[in-house]
C-alpha cells in the first residue's frame, strides 16, 4: 500500500485539489458502513489528492484501505463504478464517463490457474461490469459521452502495458468525442 501511495504522491501535483483545472470528485467506500465518501471540490478536502486516489484504488486483497479519522476507505467502484448521477448533481451539463473496468469475458483457464485471488478479482469484475452497463443503459440525465477503451485481455496489474493503455485511451476518447 505504501508503495502505491508514494507513487501517487510523486505523479500528482503537490498542491493537489487547487491544481485541478476542472472540478474533480473522487469516491471511496467506507469499509465499515458501506457509505460513499466524496473527496475533492464539493466533497472532503481534508484528504490529499494522492490519498483520495489511493483510497479509491484500494482493493483490500491487494492494497489495504486508507484510514482517515477512524474510518477505512476502499475502492469507490464497489458502490459507484461510474459516478454519473454524482457528476450530474455536481452541475455537469455534459458528462464524460470513462470506463476502464474489466469487460464481459475472461480467460477461465488462466483465471483458475492463478488461484482464488484471481477468481475473486474476476467475480468483482463481472459484478462491476454489469453495473456499469446498467448505469449507461438507464442513463436519463444530461448528455453522456461514454468512453470505453478496448482493454480485454489485460488485467488490473498489467503495469508493463501502460503505453498501450494510454494510446488506447486516447483512441477511444477521440472516437467517442467525434460522435
Task: Enumerate the predicted regions with their spans.
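Patatin-like phospholipase
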Residues: 1-179
